[in-house]
Amino acid sequence: MKRRLASKKTVVCVGPGGVGKTTTAAALGVIAARSGLRTLVCTIDPAPRLADALGVANLGAKPSPIAAATAAALGIASPDRLHAMRVDPSAAFAQLVNEQVADPELRRHIFGNPLYRSVTTNLTGSQEYAATLALYEIRRDGAYDLIVLDTPPTANALEFLETPERLATAIASPAVQWFARPDPREKRFSLKRLGVGGAMVIRRAGRLMGSQFLDDLGAFLLDIREVLGGFLARAREIEAVLKQPDVGFVLVLTPAAAAVSEALYFARRLRETGSPLCCFIANRTLPEPGNHTAASLRASLLSLPSLCDLPKEELDLATTCLARMAEFLAKIARAQKQELERLSREAPGIEITTVPLLPHDVSNIDSLRAIADRLGSG
């Protein structure tokens, strides 16, 4: 993993929610910082997972170094080698608007429009696009040797990859370009531009949502055309960045059938788009099942001081319960092994790194150090 990180400027951790993606991103940041790279780990997840993992009290939209005590506990020579931040989607969109619109009055109109706020916070893909905007700006700034991006929690790992392309396609569509076409005679948006059918739809929406909706819509459609060209250009630039050889995608998963199938599909999509897949990281893997007999399990129980004086009936019951639990875990371990073999077989040449299931939740520095040690040894 150290070798792979050394050859990259950006590592993007992708995968569905709940697979340990944020912790993996933090661990990769620790590995890079240990090797002397000035590293930034950034997330767009509003939950405090990254802050908790790195021991950062207030994770904000500006990069900040980890605490000196945290750096020492993680085996990092200097706290300045590892910074962390949380991407603010509103700030990411606002920065792009500020770049594209010179007129402060027009910027004020755009930022104050409720539809702008709704589109940039609630529209499907807005979080993913904000993450790509932040990544683009940080790379352009050049302050870090490595950027590790923890992508938004999503049910579909493809959201991050496809959002810039979808946005560019939408902006370039004839319908949006028609709305964006300048007309110097227009001081406000006119429903006449929509034709009879379109105007009827908008009027009905206005009756349902109120006249203010029509005013907000008209202002938004007129104002936003000033920035559509910039949004389109930036989306195209981000598409190009994600295909650079110094960018590596790390697909984080758990060794379950559905997760592996999604990972294989994502790997195929990456190949189709020319984006580089660095490796798979499979979290929460169980060890190879041992050959546990009833006698060996009973002996293990008797070796515990608190259980050695149990009555025979209770010891028999405990042995039976332990045997069933061992059988259950062995079944899961065998299923995981089969899924990882399928992943290796259907995605040849892509390295798979496994991280064992820890006996406790990953919520402190000791757990993060253990995962970084595991990943760094591969």
Report each predicted region and the residues it spans:
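C-terminal lobe/tail of nucleotide-utilizing enzymes
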Residues: 1-5, 195, 203-222, 232-378
